[in-house]
UniProtKB/Swiss-Prot annotation:
Tissue specificity statement from the Swiss-Prot or TrEMBL entry: Detected in kidney (at protein level). Detected in kidney cortex, in proximal tubules.
GO biological process: monoatomic ion transport; response to xenobiotic stimulus; urate transport
Species for this entry: Mus musculus
TM stretches of this protein: 10-30, 146-166, 182-202, 204-224, 232-252, 260-280, 351-371, 378-398, 412-432, 435-455, 466-486, 495-515
Recorded name of the encoding gene: Slc22a12
Gene3D superfamilies xrefs: MFS general substrate transporter like domains
Residue numbers carrying Phosphoserine: 534
Subcellular location, record wording: Apical cell membrane
Subunit composition and interactions: Interacts with PDZK1.
Protein name, per record: Solute carrier family 22 member 12
Length: 553
């Protein structure tokens, strides 16, 4: 009796799976708030140099005449490229000649200017404080803001490697529990950090734990659910990220101080840490590592929750030993990472799949973590992204089963690229159109993620499938790390980041045309199967004569 049969006996889709899904997907909503938090906690408000005539009461007392703040601003700060007060320069001396009615640009163009030596004055009408206002991450220090976002995303990359190994060694539930604790502690500590480097350090630790939460949530959902119920619970898990986008915008709208906002999205993980102790460990993992007595206890516990206590009582250690012997071998028959790059039939699949994953992570996080550049109301924009993500993810599942994997993959990468490139031509004054294009583009990227997740699983043979998918996810996280840094090109022109964000998905989408279609094709089991496949049509019989087809979704 193999493990799937054991799971069917105790219930593979029942009350327990319902409770478990609610308990595990709820933290995913709050994980999304951590991922998207710096849209708000690192927002850049309007700012100008601190100047004595406006910001020093002693200097104001000595001003001759009755001059209003607009006049004092004009004589203290030169206009910037958009004819608004410059954000990074001020006059060394007040330019009183600018108060004359016939004053022109020539009246101040030769005047000496200097950087904001005494700091900045920020507009607090939208946010009481952000990390930008706390540590003056503007002007010459503006590169530190996207650097903080890249450090967070680097933490997810490192955490995925560490937590993946740890969960295989110590168990899914145990690593998940301590990941909850690390998120709560690191997030709380980050809210109180007095310096920017310490803030980045604790955000890095938080991100590494976030990776542990995401990975082990998916593992527990999959390993405690029957094959028939897995698509449902994994879809709910994916939709948790969509609703998390809406939650992020809602919480940020109500909490305008970055320290309190960081606390607000970290505190719930203390609760998740406490109740996670009552979640069962993966019985499949326990049996695989030889902990049969614990595996038996967990199976009987699940059977009781699913009202199948009688079936659970019939399970014995002998039955579990039989299940352990019948579990498929994990031996990959010599397949390794080098196999992906040195086998002709796999090389181009690996490279193009990695390019598609890279394009998704690069473009999505590059845009989604800089909503200020896409629209004026970032709270509404964040919520709209989540609302649009819901039908796109569910709709993409239907489209790929009808139109094919390759066509949908190409479309869901090229379309957002075109939306982003179109935004270059839209004037900044047309905020609604810019926001609509941004939401549509990010929504399509959500569809691209759904497609590439399924497509890449079907492109590679069973013996090396997880290695290939893991390599592709590394490419996605590497792209996510680089995405925010592209915004630094904005110093050469506001259109430069959008050009890069638009070109990358378009090129990767076109490259996906070189991949073979996998709709209704047999899933390859060995590398030899890949080498025998033609691009258009293959047939592959399993040893018992049946045909193992690719997944319908």
């Amino acid at each position: 009796m193999a493990f799937p049969e054991l799971l069917d006996r105790v219930g593979g889709l029942g009350r327990f799976q319902l409770f478990q899904t609610v308990a595990l997907v709820t933290p995913i909503l709050w994980v999304t708030t951590q991922n998207m938090l710096e849209n708000f906690s690192a927002a850049v408000p309007h700012h100008r140099c601190w100047v004595p005539l406006l910001d020093n009461s002693t200097s104001q007392a000595s001003i001759p005449g009755d001059l209003g703040p607009d006049v004092l601003l004009a004589v203290s700060i030169p206009p910037g490229p958009d004819q608004q007060p410059h954000q990074c320069l001020r006059f060394r001396q007040p330019q009183w000649q600018l108060t004359e009615s016939n004053a022109t640009a020539t009246n101040w163009s030769d005047a000496a200017t200097e950087p904001c030596e005494d700091g900045w004055v920020y507009d607090h009408s939208t946010f009481r404080s952000t990390i930008v206002t706390t540590w003056d991450l503007v002007c010459n220090s503006q590169a530190l803001r996207p650097m903080a976002q890249s450090i967070f995303l680097a933490g997810i990359l490192v955490g995925a490697a560490v937590c993946g190994h740890a969960s295989d060694r110590f168990g899914r539930r145990r690593v998940l529990t301590w990941s909850y604790l690390l998120v709560s502690v690191s997030g709380t500590a980050a809210a109180f950090m007095p310096t920017f480097p310490l803030y980045c350090l604790f955000r890095f630790l938080l991100a590494s734990a976030v990776a542990g939460v995401m990975m082990n949530t998916a593992s527990l959902l999959m390993e405690w659910t029957s094959a028939q119920g897995s698509p449902l619970v994994m879809t709910l898990n994916a939709l948790g990220f969509s609703f998390g986008q809406v939650l992020t915008g809602s919480v940020a709208y109500g909490v305008r101080s970055w320290r309190m906002l960081q606390l607000a999205v970290s505190a719930p993980f203390f609760l998740f840490f406490v109740y996670s102790w009552w979640l069962p460990e993966s019985a499949r993992w326990l049996i695989t590592v030889g902990k049969l007595d614990q595996g038996l206890q967990e199976l009987q516990r699940v059977a009781a929750v699913n009202r199948r206590k009688a079936e659970g009582d019939t399970l014995t250690m002998e039955v579990l030993r039989s299940a352990m012997e019948e579990e498929p071998s994990r031996d990959k028959a010599g397949a390794s990472l080098g196999t992906l790059l040195h086998t002709p039939g796999l090389r181009h699949r690996t490279i193009i799949s990695m390019l598609c994953w890279f394009a998704f992570g690069f473009t999505f996080y590059g845009l989604a973590l800089d909503l200020q550049a896409l629209g004026s109301n970032i709270f509404l924009l964040q919520a709209l992204i989540g609302i649009v993500d819901f039908p796109v993810k569910t709709g993409s599942l239907l489209l790929i089963s009808r139109l094919g994997r390759r066509f949908c993959q190409v479309s869901f990468l090229v379309l957002p690229g075109l939306c982003i490139l179109s935004n270059i031509l839209v004037p900044h004054g047309m905020g609604v159109l810019r926001s609509a294009l941004a939401v549509l583009g990010l929504g399509c990227l959500g569809g691209a993620f759904t497609c590439i997740t399924i497509f890449s699983s079907e492109l590679f043979p069973t013996v090396i499938r997880m290695t290939a998918v893991g390599l592709c996810q590394v490419a996605a996280r590497g792209g996510a790390m680089l995405g925010p840094l592209v915004r630094l090109l904005g110093v050469y022109g506001s259109w430069m980041p959008l050009l890069v964000y638009g070109v990358v998905p378009v090129l990767s989408g076109l490259a996906a045309l070189l991949l073979p279609e996998t709709k209704n094709l047999p899933l390859p089991d060995t590398i030899q199967d890949i080498q025998k496949q033609s691009v258009k049509k293959v047939t592959h019989d399993t040893p018992d004569g049946s045909i193992l087809m690719s997944t319908r979704l």
